[in-house]
Design a protein with these regions (language model features):
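Active-site core segments that coordinate phosphate-bearing ligands/cofactors
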Residues: 1, 24-207, 216-240, 246-277, ...
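Divalent-metal (Mg2+/Mn2+/Ca2+)-assisted nucleotide/phosphate chemistry catalytic cores
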Residues: 1-6, 12-15, 21, 29
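Short linear loop/turn motifs
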Residues: 10-18, 127-132
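Small/polar loops that bind or transfer phosphate-bearing groups
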Residues: 14, 212, 236
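General small-molecule cofactor/ligand-binding pocket signal
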Residues: 7-13, 38, 233
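Short Asp/Glu-rich motifs
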Residues: 18-19, 244
């Protein structure tokens, strides 16, 4: 225990609880009209998951950005040897749900590689890097995105090349080869995590919903569909903000419940659909990837 007095902390309340109204001095300071204060699904991932426009209550979500937070919603915590082995957590979500998920490295790998090239005097936009990756040879080399060497700032392209050399794979040399290696490796790690979720939940989740800023990397979304062998739906980009708003609208009675909120979001924003391709090639490459990360 910290020894801090309990009275200095606020009450713990469920997401969607109306906590009160703005104090008069706060309204005056910020120039606001009278407004209710409503708790939302915290933190940012909690609100992002509220906004997932899933067609059913059986889905896998990926909140995609610098990190990829992957998981599913359950009615009760999943506490098993397998969940501990796979490093999954159970967090309280909106509407008495459990956010059963884990963090894996995300587009940090591409972001930091881009910064390294900029330090070396070469500037690229993300669409330019994606175009280079499209031109590179497919399914050639893989890394474990969660290897500790990739977790700190620095020369990630060099570290990626060293990893591939150490694991007796073709060494990516061009910018396109490096970015393609990153994106394909992330997609493979998604499949590894998806398979673990299926195992722990005792059923095959039919689809994957990707939300957040990482949905703008459409090549990764297609690779995720290819690797996981299931349909991928992407959007909205501003998932956290929309989930925050949705929780407030439910609390105010403007939207019926979580299911209706997701329907509203699905019908209000462009949701892109990616269908699996090249199944045999990706399945064969996945076997290579699994061997690699288990060594």
């Amino acid at each position: 225990r910290s020894g801090l007095p309990r009275g200095i902390f606020g009450d713990i309340v469920a997401p969607g609880t109306v906590c009160g109204t703005l104090l008069p001095q706060v309204k005056e300071e910020v120039g606001a009209l009278s407004a209710k204060v409503i708790s939302v699904a915290a933190h940012d991932t909690g609100s992002a998951v509220v906004s997932v426009p899933a067609a059913t209550d059986k889905f896998i979500f990926i909140s995609s950005g610098t990190w990829s937070i992957m998981g599913t919603e359950t009615k009760a915590p999943v506490v098993t040897d397998a969940s501990q082995r796979h490093n999954f957590t159970n967090e309280g979500g909106y509407g008495n749900t459990i956010r059963f998920s884990k963090n894996i490295t995300g587009l940090w790998l591409e972001q930091e590689s881009r910064r390294q090239w900029e330090r070396e005097g070469e500037k690229f936009t993300y669409p330019e890097l994606t175009a280079l990756a499209r031109e590179a040879a497919p399914l050639r080399s893989f890394i474990d995105p969660d290897d500790a060497r990739f977790s700190t700032p620095g020369n990630l392209p060099k570290r990626i090349a060293e990893y591939c050399a150490e694991t007796n794979q073709p060494v990516p040399e061009t910018k396109g080869e490096i970015v393609r290696c990153i994106l394909e490796s992330l997609a493979m790690k998604y499949r590894y995590t998806v398979d673990a979720i299926d195992e722990m939940c005792g059923e095959r989740m039919p689809a994957i919903n990707i939300v957040g800023g990482g949905t703008q990397e459409k090549l990764l979304s297609q690779y995720a569909a290819n690797a996981c062998g299931r349909d991928v739906y992407t959007g909205p980009v501003e998932a956290t903000a929309l989930g925050n708003i949705a929780a407030q609208l439910i609390a105010l009675g403007e939207i019926k419940d979580l299911s209706e909120a997701r329907d509203v979001i699905a019908n209000s924003f462009e949701i892109e659909h990616f269908v699996p391709q090249d199944k045999a090639a990706w399945d064969a490459a996945y076997e290579k990837f699994v061997t690699l990360i288990k060594e």
